[in-house]
Design a protein with these regions (language model features):
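Outer membrane beta-barrel
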Residues: 93-240, 270, 465-471
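Residues on the lipid-exposed face of transmembrane beta-strands in outer-membrane beta-barrel proteins
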Residues: 81-87, 97, 143-148, 204-208, ...
Length: 494
């Protein structure tokens, strides 16, 4: 408790110093410019208990992985400080640092939970994250890279995140970086997409604009991670957002030295922007193959949690090709978007008698078709942004005894529709937002929200997540029914 109070005061003091500096303009130390924000988030729960924390082999058990049974009061309460330090070293060379500091207070304010590690990183090569901390506090050097620009060449070297594609809510082309799901899964404000939860990795990234007359902005991009592998980071078992049932234990088997290699060509022809993409990398999500069974629950003290199925979490190499097209439909005042990828060797599991025995490969084709259009709805106010998306996932080959990485049976096709509305008011001081996602197998995610810009440095976000539907297979949106809840964020920017 004393340590938690100390960390709280440290973050408040750092944030206060940063905010005070904003009153005098941009904060500088020599040639370095410092910007960033401090944020406080409260995410009370309105749903039932998370079944993953109570799923024992013998059936639901209470209190399971929690200190006491029942639905929690909070899913998350945290504060964090995000800094961006930029230095221009010469006309062509610059350097960027992005340190972040987290303090998770959820366990302190909600006695439903035992002590768990809020920032687990149990895999070979965890030093690649540049993180340090304890159960409640985490400090990381999230990004660290050099930028070099000379003529048509742009080079970025270091720990960085790379975003391809523009799909909202689901990833099609945006699969270069794994995701950090340890705190909030991906249920934060949807309009921010995955910017805050992509895990930056060590890349050499080079862009070269190819001189030509037909396509003046024709650009080739190459990226290489020489083998500093980081998998998807999941919440700890026993935590509010735990995704792994209590009777499972996944041992990450991450092979360092496996490179990530990719490239794309982008350009504009008339009203059409296009990209052609290629990427090969170890699969981000662990593919859990049966390794052992721990039968400790059959011996005194007969604790049902002591019976566990142990899975070997493997990360086989995948290859992905794809592309995108954006069309500026001037007559309709709309942007038409399309993204597609094909992964010929996506990993699945051969599951016999509920036991994943080996990895099998199947081709997977993902496509998103989208329309974005600004439309004047409220007289005297800015236009409303309206975005509609259609997602399809097609899995080829035999699906007999086939399960995905969540352990769910696999459909040949899965279809999802999304609608996003954003209405700015009062010179963009207030923004009303609504995101809706509907899975045609009967599942949904609805997120209404409001954003209020208070002055020049303070922002208040109020949102609500609601999940539901009859489709509750693990990994489908209906399975997150327990994650219903409001969240409020106060952000002080500088």
């Amino acid at each position: 408790m004393q340590q938690g109070k100390l960390l709280t005061w440290v973050l408040f003091i750092l944030a206060w110093l940063a905010i005070e500096s904003a009153a005098w303009g941009q904060y500088r130390i020599g040639d370095f410019e410092i910007t960033g924000y401090y944020q406080y988030t409260i995410n009370p729960s309105t749903g039932p208990r998370n079944p993953n924390n109570f799923a024992c082999l013998t059936g639901p058990c209470s209190p399971g992985l929690q200190r006491k049974g029942g639905a929690p009061d909070f899913l998350l309460m945290r504060q964090f400080l995000d800094l961006n330090i930029y230095g221009k070293l010469s006309e062509n060379l610059s350097i960027t640092f992005q340190p972040r500091f987290f303090h998770d207070m959820t366990k302190s304010v909600d006695n439903h939970f035992r002590q768990y590690d809020s920032f687990p990183r149990n895999f070979r090569g965890q030093g690649n994250l540049l993180e340090a901390g304890g159960n409640d506090f985490n400090a990381e050097l999230r990004q660290l890279y050099l930028d070099y620009k000379e003529g048509n060449l742009w080079l970025r070297v270091g720990k960085q995140q790379i975003a391809w594609g523009e799909a909202l809510g689901l990833r099609v082309l945006d699969t270069i970086n794994p995701l950090d799901l340890r705190q909030f899964v991906f249920f934060d404000r949807i309009f921010e997409e995955f910017d805050r939860i992509r895990i930056p990795q060590w890349f050499i990234r080079a862009n070269y604009t190819i001189p030509n007359e037909a396509i003046p902005d024709l650009t080739g991009e190459f990226l290489l991670n020489p083998g500093a592998v980081v998998p998807t980071l999941l919440p700890a078992q026993g935590s509010p957002y735990n995704l792994v049932p209590a009777f499972l234990r996944v041992r990450e088997n991450v092979n360092q030295g496996e490179p990530t290699v990719g490239g794309r060509v982008t350009g504009t022809v008339g009203d059409v922007q296009f990209s052609v993409n290629f990427l090969t990398k170890p699969n981000d999500d662990a593919v859990g193959v049966f390794k052992a069974f721990n039968g400790g629950c059959f011996a005194p003290p007969f604790n049902p949690l002591d019976c566990q199925v142990i899975l070997d979490g493997r990360h086989p190499r995948i290859y992905t090709v794809g592309g995108s097209v954006n069309y500026n439909w001037t007559w309709a005042g709309a942007i038409l978007r399309a993204e597609t990828t094909v992964t010929p060797n996506a990993p699945f599991l051969r599951t016999i008698a509920a036991t994943p025995t080996r990895i099998v490969e199947r081709p997977v084709w993902k496509t998103v078709l989208a329309v974005d259009r600004p439309t004047y709805i409220v007289p005297g106010q800015d236009s409303m942004t309206i975005g509609f998306q259609f997602f399809e996932t097609f899995t080829g080959g035999s699906r007999s005894a086939l399960t995905d990485t969540f352990g769910s049976t696999v459909d040949q096709t899965a279809h999802v529709f999304t609608l996003f509305l954003q209405q700015p008011l009062f010179e963009k001081r207030i923004s009303l937002e609504l995101f809706t996602l509907f899975d045609t197998d009967d599942a949904h995610w609805i997120q209404p929200g409001i954003r209020w810009e208070i002055g020049n440095n303070v922002r208040l976000d109020l949102y609500y997540n609601e999940f539901g539907g009859a489709e509750k297979r693990p990994g489908r949106f209906g399975s997150f029914f327990w994650a219903d809840g409001a969240f409020a964020r106060v952000t002080f920017g500088f």
